[in-house]
Structure formats: structure tokens, C-alpha cells
């Protein structure tokens, strides 16, 4: 039983408000810096109240960073990775839960263990595969002594190279597996009696039931893929056509090597531009996101 007293309520609200202020303070500083001119931003201390140059700085940041192109690239990559993760996670969890075969739990735990292997750890072999996606198959053919030369498939500087290496997800597989385990067995038996095969059961029964779970996973993965920096920086050398929004931020803050001081007001405006899409997605899917994580009704 949870006690409700005026003192505990006051302490709880004080803790929550303090945490909210600590979370919002960096965002407020970014917003304030993006609304001032160059001279005001470089004052010590910098004013903590917004100025009247926000639209000017946003326009300059958009033009300087070529955001009309890179925002589209980031959107393509984020949507592609999100859809790929949802499809791969749902299919793998469906196989593990609804099909009985040897080593299925071993396969699940092998997938789950990859949570301890972030992209930074496997960056070198992943890049090697992206440089020639058919090289592992060619090596297998060579070991088996099959005289077949596969063509080179280079994924660098392509949307495929930005998306495909990121679509595997242990988190999504785990979430879908836990959801599928809560689906009543009677529903599966009823689908079998109605003549539904595995694919039809998956598409017409499980997928509609997992809408909230899908929305929660989509929110997490969209924000994660939108904020990717290391992998696009490594796999993209054609910055004019395939650079993403997070990569473009480095060009907004020129250093001494560029012959001019950092323009922090424009850089902060660029951060607001890059921050807007994931914030908008999170706000729009917030209710579905919470329901997908805590809802147990089917």
C-alpha cells in the first residue's frame, strides 16, 4: 500500500521538479543561445533570457548546413532502420515463440547477448562487410572449394549501407517475444481451426494485436537511428549526397583551421533543427509508447 501524506507528496513533487529542471536546463541554454546574435552569445556570462535573433539564426543554420538535403537523408535512414528493425524483430520473435525446433532458445540467447555488443565494438568487421557485402559468401565458397566468383557489392555511400547494418535488434526481438508469450494459446488454436497458416496468423492476428508494442519500438528506434553519428560518419564519404543531419552539425561550428571563430549561436540553432524531428515523433507517439511498454490487455 502506498502512503499519501502532505509531507511525502511535497518531497516527491520537489524531487520530480528538480529532475525536470536539470533535464530542461541544457535545452533551455541551447534555445537561448540560438536566439541571440554572435556578440551576445560570447558574453561572459551569457544572458539566460531569449533574444530576438532566433529566426535569423535558424535560417542561417539551414542554409549553412544544407539541411534541406541532409534532413531528407536522415529521414530516409531513420524510417528505413525503424521499419527494418520492427520487421526483423517481429519475425525472429515469432519464430522463437511459435515454432518448435532444436536450439531455438540457444539462438534467442545468442541474439540477446548481442545487447552487450554495441555498434562501436563491431564497427571494424561491420565496415568490412559493408565494403563488400558478398565477401563472407565468397570466403565460404572458397573454403568449400566451389569455383564461383561472386561480384563485389559495395554498400559504402549508399542508403543500403546506412540502413542494412543497423536493422538487427536484440531489444526489439526481446520485446516482441515477451508480448507473443502473453497471447493466449486458445487464440492460436482458434486460428488453426479456422484454417489460418503461420503467415496469415502472423499478419492478421499477431500484428494487429501488437500495435502498441510496435509503436513503442518504433519510437525508440526512430530516435536511436536519427541520432546515429559514428556509423554514417564512417560509411559516408560523399557528404554532398549522403550526409545525415547529425554529421552536418560539425560543419556549423568552424574552428581555427577554417580561419574564423566558432559561431555558437548558429550552431545552437542547427541543434534545434536536428532535435525537432525526434522530439516531434516522441510527442506524437507518446501515448502509444507508454501503452506499448506497460499495457497487458489483449
Each language-model region and where it sits:
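A structural signal for multi-pass alpha-helical bundles of membrane permease subunits
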Residues: 2, 8-298
